[in-house]
Amino acid sequence: MLEMAVAALPPGKEVKAKLGRDDWLMRGFIAVIALYLIVALALPLYAMLSKAFSTYQFDLTQYEFQVSDEDGNFDGTIFSAAELNTETGAFSSEDLIAGSGDRLAVTGFFPDFSFRSPVIYKVRGTSNSVTFLAGSERLTGTEWREFDSNAFRKVVMRPAASTGLGNFTRYFSTPALVRSIQNSLVISIISTVITVSLAFGFAYSLNRSCMRFKGLFRLIAMAPILVPSLLPGIALVYLFGNQGILKAVMMGESIYGPYGIIAGSIFFTFPHAMLIITTALAISDARLYEAATSLRASRWKTFWTVTIPGARYGLISAAFVVFNLVITDFGLPKVIGGQFNVLAVDIYKQVIGQQNFEMGAVVSVVLLVPALIAFSIDRIVQRKQVALLSARSVVYEAKPNKTFDWMCFGYCGIIAFFIIGILGICQYAALIKFWPYDLSLSLNNYAFDLMDGGGWQAYRNSIKLALLTAFFGTVVVFVGAYMVEKTEGFTSGRTAFQFLAMMPMAIPGMVLGLAYIFFFNNPANPLNFIYATMAILVLSTITHFYTVSHLTAATALKQMDNEFESVAASLKQPFYKLFARVSVPVCLPAILDISIYLFVNAMTTVSAVVFLYSSGTALASIAVLNMDDAGDIAPAAAMGMMIFYTNIAARLIHAGISRGVLKRTQSWRAR
């Protein structure tokens, strides 16, 4: 009876737990860091998209003129600019399409104009919103402005702004620009196929053979991560350029163009693909191979029916990562691309070369599309890769096979020789007096203060940027990841934060840098004061590399038992004590990994900062680009190698600190 009575009770109101001080503080931290991502990422991208859809055209119906006789008398006749243009044919419809910074001289409407003439001119707009310039003076409104002939030649029209698809129409109707899309896609696909194939062979050799020196080969394979993407381009010029050591190997072909871009892309994307594929092969289940052996399947059949299916997600993920890296890279095609245009270089040419910011924004949007598609597919693939290993899985262990092991050793040796050769030729070129005429050794190429590019100050700026990025980036990323992972409830806010945290990985550095110009260079923006300072370089670098750092921190935090929070709550300890005394010490290895990741990428990045540096904040990676542009290729190679050695030193320091930290704070892991 009692059970029936209880069952008959009407449902009551849902009781929600009252939020405590810690809950509000943690949600506040999420809001603050989310605001940072909105200001540093979402709003600049919105500004760039707005610029891409902003069209400018000279509206001749908005301007009217009066012309006096030689005695300075006006007869009251009013001419519109449109009427004068129809009569004289001074400007075609294409001439009237403009950018925001373009100007149109009004003297073009008067074929007989002479600045020595005694004729006087009057100009006005047809509405109060119409503006024109008389020299540096900005004039507006419907009031007549009078000019003598000498002053009239300084009067120019400003284009009228509107919103539409005009910029995209112009882009896709320009064959040279559209060809860049095809070039970028072809180069990226070819580079991806070759790189993933080579990386798979290398990773397979490391995981499935018993060859010697695996650690050394793995170390060499990671070296390209420590140099800017421009460096392999410089090395290829010294090897296969017009005065290269191995020019004859090209058999009349030029290294400047697709061949050079593909070869250089293989070099700098190889470690990324190798790491992903190595991880995929490392989680193979030995029971599947035992089953194949018991069924008397050949090694070839086992490879295609067990190994490849087991590594398929890693291969797909590696392919899209490499594709994204190649299609968004700017430094390499800028150095060795020659006349072979690609999208990333087109952005640079439109913005720096032609000052056409609207078209630069359009190219950025076009580049954003394949990058977003590749990123989205990669994320889908990574989600499907979960739970490939079960609790009953057995880790695969390679068995000695002398012939196979030597084959793997030879293969890895060839790859290692290629990587060492690229780095070695750069160092050799940096020590040569004058290639190829005077091959005596000298340190003259390290006299950076005598070269264009920023000198040694650029190198010091890079170290400063890397240290600031590593420190502030690690703090922001880890605090943000902690708040998202450890905050209870607040599902909508945490989901929104995760979305913002994932966005930077899909945004090419060139696109982010251009977006920063539109957003932070706006005088109406209260944050305009950070433009052209070290602060904006730090901000853009942290934002550009935020996603990988966030995922690293989140992975480390997910490995911690949630009981820590429950125990702290039962002891009435505030969350910040748990954070400082437990979470940070436990996750210290991951924190150190985040800091070195940010440091190395800040030293090598080009695309994210190429639009944002000033004369006082030039960086080493930018100095490499500028010295190469100026023809100082050997000093450019020397600066590139300085970046390499700095990153090696940083890695060694990181390894030493990590080892000490593991001994002092992570001994519990071995119990």
Stretches with model-predicted labels:
Residues M1-A31, D378-I414, S492, A655-R671:
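Transmembrane alpha-helical segments of polytopic membrane transport and secretion proteins
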Residues V6-L9, L60, R158-G164, L239-M250, ...:
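Peri-membrane helix termini and adjoining interfacial loops of integral membrane proteins
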Residues G12, K16-R27, A47-E83, E87-T88, ...:
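Periplasmic/extracellular loop-to-transmembrane helix junction in inner-membrane transport proteins
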Residues D22-D59, Y171-A282, G310-G331, V362-D378, ...:
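Membrane-water interface segments at the C-terminal ends of transmembrane alpha-helices
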Residues T279-Y289, R299, A554-F564:
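Membrane-helix/interface signature in polytopic inner-membrane proteins
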Residues A292, A568:
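The alpha-helix within a helix-turn-helix
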Residues F330-Q354, P436-L439, V606-I633, S667-R671:
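Glycine-rich helix-loop "coupling/hinge" segments at transmembrane-helix boundaries
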Residues Y348-P370:
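Helix-loop-helix hairpin linking two adjacent transmembrane segments in secondary transporters
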